[in-house]
C-alpha cells in the first residue's frame, strides 16, 4: 500500500495535555485525505500506573502485566478513534489479518498492543511489514538517536542517520537504559528483514510529519 503511512506514537503523548493531542487529530484528519493511516499508540503513564498497582498487590505474572499494558495502549487508541471517527475504524485493531481487511474500507486504523510480550515498536514494524510499507514514522520521547543516554552523558553523540546494525550494537551494549531506550531488538530484526526505514522524531513536534513527507529529516533515520 504505497499511499499508506504507518505512524507510531509514544504513550507519553497521552500524559501531556489535550491541546497537543488535538493537534495530532487535526494533522491526521488532514493527511487522511491523501493517505491511509495506520496509527500505533503506546500505553504511557496509564500503563505504568496500573502495572505499578498490579505489582503492589502481588501480580508477578508477566502475562498479566503485559495485558494491562496492552489495554492501556488500547484506551489511548480509543481516544484517537473517538475523535477521528467516521474516518477511523470504530475500535482498536486486534490483529494483522483484521488490519488488512479494515484498511480496504477505512482511511484510518488505530492499534494499541496486540499480544503479550510485544512492544509497540514491534507492533509498528509488523504493521508496516504486513501492509508492505517501507517506512515507519516514530514519534518518540527523544529528538534523535544517541550513542548513549544524553541525560547522563553530556558527550553523547547524536545521529542524523544510523544503520540498524550499528543501533543493534549500541542496544546490545545496554548503553540506552530505562526511559531512553527507544526501540527493541525484535523491532530492528523486523525492519532489517523487510528493509523498513524508521524515522525518529520528537512527539512534542507533531508537524514534523510534513517535513518527513517532503523528504526532510527532522530527527534520525534508522536504515536497513
Curated annotation (Swiss-Prot):
ATP binds at residues 8-12, 44, 48, 140, 146, 149. Inhibited by UTP. Its EC number is 2.7.4.22. InterPro entries: AceGlu_kinase-like_sf, Asp/Glu/Uridylate_kinase, Uridylate_kinase_arch/spir. It catalyses: UMP + ATP = UDP + ADP. Catalyzes the reversible phosphorylation of UMP to UDP. Belongs to the UMP kinase family. This is Uridylate kinase. It comes from Staphylothermus marinus (strain ATCC 43588 / DSM 3639 / JCM 9404 / F1). The lineage of its organism: Archaea, Thermoproteota, Thermoprotei, Desulfurococcales, Desulfurococcaceae. The gene is pyrH.
Amino acid at each position: 500500500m504505497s499511499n499508506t503511512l504507518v505512524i507510531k506514537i509514544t504513550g507519553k503523548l497521552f500524559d501531556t495535555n489535550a491541546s497537543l493531542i488535538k493537534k495530532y487529530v487535526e494533522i491526521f484528519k488532514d493527511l487522511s485525505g491523501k493517505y491511509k493511516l495506520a496509527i500505533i499508540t503506546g500505553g504511557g503513564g496509564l500503563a505504568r500506573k496500573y502495572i505499578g498497582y498490579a505489582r503492589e498487590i502481588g501480580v508477578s505474572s508477566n502475562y498479566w502485566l503485559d495485558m494491562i499494558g496492552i489495554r492501556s495502549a488500547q484506551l489511548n487508541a480509543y481516544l484517537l478513534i473517538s475523535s477521528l471517527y467516521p474516518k477511523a475504524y470504530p475500535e482498536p485493531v486486534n490483529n494483522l489479518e483484521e488490519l488488512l481487511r479494515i484498511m480496504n474500507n477505512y482511511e484510518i486504523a488505530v492499534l494499541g498492543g496486540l499480544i503479550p510480550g510485544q512492544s509497540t515498536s514491534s507492533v509498528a514494524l509488523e504493521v508496516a511489514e504486513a501492509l508492505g510499507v517501507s517506512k515507519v514514522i516514530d514519534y518518540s520521547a527523544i529528538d534523535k538517536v544517541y550513542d548513549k543516554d544524553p541525560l547522563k552523558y553530556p558527550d553523547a553523540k547524536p545521529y542524523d542517520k544510523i544503520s540498524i546494525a550499528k543501533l543493534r550494537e549500541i542496544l546490545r551494549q545496554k548503553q540506552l537504559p530505562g526511559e531512553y531506550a527507544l526501540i527493541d531488538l525484535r523491532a530492528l530484526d523486523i525492519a532489517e528483514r523487510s528493509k523498513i526505514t524508521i524515522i525518529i522524531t520528537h512527539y512534542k513536534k507533531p508537524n514534523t510529519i510534513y517535513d518527513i513527507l517532503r523528504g526532510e529529516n527532522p530527527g534520525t533515520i534508522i536504515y536497513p
